[in-house]
Amino acid sequence: MKVFDSSAVLAVIFQEPGADVAAALMSQDNALISSVNLAEVVGRLLDEGLSNAEAAGACEQLPLRVVPLSRAQATAAGQLKPGTRTRGLSLGDRCCLALAQEHPSAVVVTSDRPWTGLAGFDIKLIR
């Protein structure tokens, strides 16, 4: 199972370095994204000048299963803050990790180097 951070999804959409790695992982079965991270993707697409319809269409094309943020994930994301504060992880980042915690064999796919070495997580950097 792969859990995608918004940075890896945006790399695919914008064909940034690492897009090939992220796209290959995304095309495998059981690729997930938290609804919070999808919201980050949509926001970035709008920042880049896409219309609401274009941003929604781009997200619909992604072979990812969107997982709504649950109460348990929200709590877990909050509990991750003390251990990730020094790495500069955002709320969205912690929601991604909280989703991954629910799937013990999950690989977290990101382009964010500060995630490397986070205890208890299998992190795959795309670049």
Spans of features found by a protein language model:
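Active-site neighborhoods of divalent-metal-dependent phosphate/nucleic-acid chemistry enzymes
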Residues: 65-107
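Histidine- and aromatic-rich ligand-binding microenvironments
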Residues: 2-5, 33-35, 89-91, 112, ...
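Short, structured coil segments at secondary-structure junctions
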Residues: 27, 62, 119-121
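A general structural signal for well-ordered alpha-helical segments in protein cores
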Residues: 19, 38, 52, 74-77, ...
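Alpha-helix capping/helix-boundary segments
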Residues: 8-9, 37, 73, 95-96, ...
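Acidic, PIN/NYN-like endoribonuclease modules and their adjacent C-terminal/linker elements
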Residues: 1, 97-127
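Short, well-structured N-terminal submotif of metal-dependent ribonuclease cores
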Residues: 1-33, 45-57
